[in-house]
Amino acid sequence: MSRESKPTTSEAHGRLWGARARDWAEFQEGTVRPVFEAVLERTRVGPGTRYLDAGCGSGMAAAMAAARGAEVSGVDAAEPMLSVARERVPTGDFRRGDLEELPFPDEAFDVVTGFNSFQYAANPVAALREAGRVAKRGGSIVVMTFGAPEGMEVVSLLTALRPLLPAPPPGAPGPFALSDEGVLRRFAEDAGLEPQEIFDVDSPWIYADESAALRGLTSTGTRSGRWSTSARPP
């Protein structure tokens, strides 16, 4: 008698985030556009840049990098998200995979980004170490995560919508897992990286109407069991 193997945290998140990939792409991903623009500008992504978005979702950041002339790649756990990314950037190399085991060779990229992705890794230090492995020496690695949840309008919105969102995998970290001051820096140092700077970008969540807001907000993967900012140690 055989038993089904338990899905990994990455696989479980892939199923949950992929459930409403089209809604994410149409209504929600654009709320992060100011962050994409700021990061691509700071890292000077342009013609010939080898660019990887780790946790690429439906590919908006990759599409923006491609529009600047970059050679883009992306990895994500959700195949439906990757399908949208491939439509947006037919020349891109988009692969299903885990942040802790990136399916790319050493020193393959000039710039590696992770927008709202590394906080969901079961082992964020391992994921950051992988980002360092695939980045070339002297390359840039940029990790975007939410600020502290206190006072954030989005927290009240997502709290109100909790009954409409699926539960996260047992024991999985939540959206604010890397938000405590110093946590991301410490994990990056533990991964062998040398943090250079921390900067804030305002990214208002604005929707055309209530229907768009509901579809966008309910495409955001899972609810959080509690709005904790603690991260699991490596």
Predicted segments with their positions:
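Conserved class I S-adenosyl-L-methionine
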Residues: 2-49, 60-64, 81-84, 88
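Short glycine-centered segments of the SAM/dcSAM-binding site in methyltransferase folds
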Residues: 50, 139-140
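C-terminal helical/coil "lid" or tail adjacent to the Rossmann-like core of SAM-dependent
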Residues: 3-6, 10, 17, 195-234
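A short acidic, Gly/Pro-enriched loop at the edge of an enzyme's catalytic core
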Residues: 100-111
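Helix-to-beta-strand junctions that scaffold the AdoMet/dcAdoMet cofactor pocket
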Residues: 121-122, 135-137
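Conserved catalytic/acceptor-binding region of the Class I
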Residues: 125, 132, 140-208, 222-225, ...
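A short SAM/SAH-binding and catalytic strip from SAM-dependent methyltransferases
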Residues: 111-124, 147
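Class I SAM-dependent methyltransferase SAM/SAH-binding core
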Residues: 50-102
